[in-house]
Amino acid sequence: MTKNATSASVITRLSPAKINLFLHITGKRADGYHNLQTVFRLLDWGDYLHFSVADELIITIDSVADNSAVDNSSLCGQLLTLSGADTITSSIEDNLIFKAANALLASAINSNSLPKNLPKVSVRLDKHLPMGAGLGGGSSNAATTLLVLNKIWQINFDQDTLIKIGASIGADVPIFIFGQDAIAMGIGEELTAIDLPEQQYLVLTPKAHVNTAELFAHSKLQRDIAPLSIKTIQNHSNDYVQHLNTPYQNVFTPVVTNLAPAVDEALRYLQELETQALSTARMTGSGSAVFLPLDAGVISDKARLAKWIEEAPCPAYLVRNL
């Protein structure tokens, strides 16, 4: 399937995965959230979302000046149907795709930007990314929904506005709206583009899920790494792109590998391949997925790659950057 496709009434979009090349916590905020520093890398691998646009229009308002009278939740229920997500959440309202559509409508109402007529849209999710893996699947679904419905419904918010809406849904949503590799700060919404070399990765997805709230509350989690300047991160990419050198790390790794034996096993498997791959294995996000950057020499050795995938202790995928 192509990454993105459009027919007369169906729009198909890749909802890509992400990995964190490193992940630091630099302190706790007054609002209870934590400040982070990371480099996000988007992957040419993920879920697919199919948006089918109906001919039927819903009259949303009597006039463009009457936005305040609209109930966005009720309107979203009329406008949006969702399939393929039945096993993810107990109800459509809890799904991040629906939440994204609802947040988009709410922002349009609040800014008096809601068009008078909107078409109904059916969204079908083809889920490929495992949940709770640190790959950003749900957040990517939300971001893709915001981007596509913003155009279908002709709300026409700019990227900065969509990023603000995305941040209200989840900390990882903004990077997928930004749409390119980036240095991230704050809770993940302060994004600076970064140019990184083309890269392929071996990604392992062990069946393990550790509650994120439990991780952030864990006594062994390091929460006070000294912040790095954007310039430092830009100028020292050799310390985290292929290898992971001090001070770069993923602070969640020791906590997660202690709590989840399957993650520890998967990471140890990749660590045994580091000498051949000429790189450093690591975990993405707060887990459970782990990955190994691959040297060009490894990529050309198809038999060796096939062996690594076959012998992996859990599902393994060969992917590249977006």
From Swiss-Prot:
Enzyme's top EC category: transferase
Enzyme Commission number, as recorded: 2.7.1.148
Residues binding ATP: 130-140
Reactions catalysed according to its record: 4-CDP-2-C-methyl-D-erythritol + ATP = 4-CDP-2-C-methyl-D-erythritol 2-phosphate + ADP + H(+)
Protein family per UniProt: Belongs to the GHMP kinase family. IspE subfamily.
Annotated function: Catalyzes the phosphorylation of the position 2 hydroxy group of 4-diphosphocytidyl-2C-methyl-D-erythritol.
Identification of the protein by name: 4-diphosphocytidyl-2-C-methyl-D-erythritol kinase
Organism: Psychrobacter cryohalolentis (strain ATCC BAA-1226 / DSM 17306 / VKM B-2378 / K5)
Taxonomic path: Bacteria, Pseudomonadati, Pseudomonadota, Gammaproteobacteria, Moraxellales
